[in-house]
Every structure is written in structure tokens, then in C-alpha cells.
């Protein structure tokens, strides 16, 4: 598989979410491509989470985060991974029904993925506050962070599937009659 790698880094005391099927030992030391630092509560002086950041070049494109609104390139916006049931899905909404904490970074000399196995609130500031910087904040700081590297976006996606397992696709007939409780206008 060439240069494909998955590295795991553990912070705090994470909850086992069963999101990962490939059990890897946690590495220690510096995280490649990311800077990690604690988030300090200004009132108490105690740690209240962890912040990861990396610099971005103008050409960098950011993909991922699953069920979030806006276009394919997530750059220039802020997203919150915290499941909410929003009736009106407009572009100013930061989170939806599901949290998918996978971000793919593609740019000149840059190609990697970040996956946070964190059931808590995670904020992704992807060049919203500063155009040249991405900042990811885990509110509780208890998580497993995975760095995925490969020679192409397809290879990184393949590594992610190896990490989290293959999705089950039921046969078409298994869906039966599907009905929504919402009303939809004829379009």
C-alpha cells in the first residue's frame, strides 16, 4: 500500500464508541502536521478541553464532516459536531443529525486526514477566524485522534474504511415502503 499509514493518539480518558474496528496502539510524542494544546478556562485556570491546529495555504481544500450544510470545500466556515434536530436546514446552521468527525486536507505538498473519535462537542474552525489556520476544539478533551496518510484522497478514504470497517449495504428490497412524517410540496 505504499505510504499509507494510520496513527492513533490518545488524550484523556476517552469513551469507547465502537466507531473503530482496527485496534491500534496509541503513539506518543508530537502529532505529525498538528499542534496540540490544552484549552484553559480563563475563570478557573483549569483545563477544559484540547485544541488542535494546523496552518493552511491559500490553495488548500478541506473535505468531510459528513452531514453539514454548504459546499464540498468546508474552508472558511465554522462547524460544530454536536447532534441537533434542526427543522430548518439553512447555511447558518452549524450541526445536523449526525456528527462525522473526519476531515480530509488536500493541497500542494499536503494530503492527510484527521479523524476524531470523540462523542462530545467538537468545534471545527476551518479558516473562519483566521484564513490561514484551522482550529479543532474538543470540549471535553477525552478522545482518540487518528492521522490518516496516503498517496491520494482515494487511498486515505480506503484507510478510513480500514479503520472504521466496511458499511453494510442491505439489498434494495429490504427497504420496503418508506414514508416521511414531513410534508413535501410537489416540485
Region locations from a protein language model:
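Catalytic and substrate-binding clefts that recognize carbohydrates or anionic sugar/phosphate headgroups
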Residues: 1-172, 180-182
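Conserved, well-structured core segments
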Residues: 177
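Short, acidic/polar
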Residues: 185-187
Amino acid at each position: 500500500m505504499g505510504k499509507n499509514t494510520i496513527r492513533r493518539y490518545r488524550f484523556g480518558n476517552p469513551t469507547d464508541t465502537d466507531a473503530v474496528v482496527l485496534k491500534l496502539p496509541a503513539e506518543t510524542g508530537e502529532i505529525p502536521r498538528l499542534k496540540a494544546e490544552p484549552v484553559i478556562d480563563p475563570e478557573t485556570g483549569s483545563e477544559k478541553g484540547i485544541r488542535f491546529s494546523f496552518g493552511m495555504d491559500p490553495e488548500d481544500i478541506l473535505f468531510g464532516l459528513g452531514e453539514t450544510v454548504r459546499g464540498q470545500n468546508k474552508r472558511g466556515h465554522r462547524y460544530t459536531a454536536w447532534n441537533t434536530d434542526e427543522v430548518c436546514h439553512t447555511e447558518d446552521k452549524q450541526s445536523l443529525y449526525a456528527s462525522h468527525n473526519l476531515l480530509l486536507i488536500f493541497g500542494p505538498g499536503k494530503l492527510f486526514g484527521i479523524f476524531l473519535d470523540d462523542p462530545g462537542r467538537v468545534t471545527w474552525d476551518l479558516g473562519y477566524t483566521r484564513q490561514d489556520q484551522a482550529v479543532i476544539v474538543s470540549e471535553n478533551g477525552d478522545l482518540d485522534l487518528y492521522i490518516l496518510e496516503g498517496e491520494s484522497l482515494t487511498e486515505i478514504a480506503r484507510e478510513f474504511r480500514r479503520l472504521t470497517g466496511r458499511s453494510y449495504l442491505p439489498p434494495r428490497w429490504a427497504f420496503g415502503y418508506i414514508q416521511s412524517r414531513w410534508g413535501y410540496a410537489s416540485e
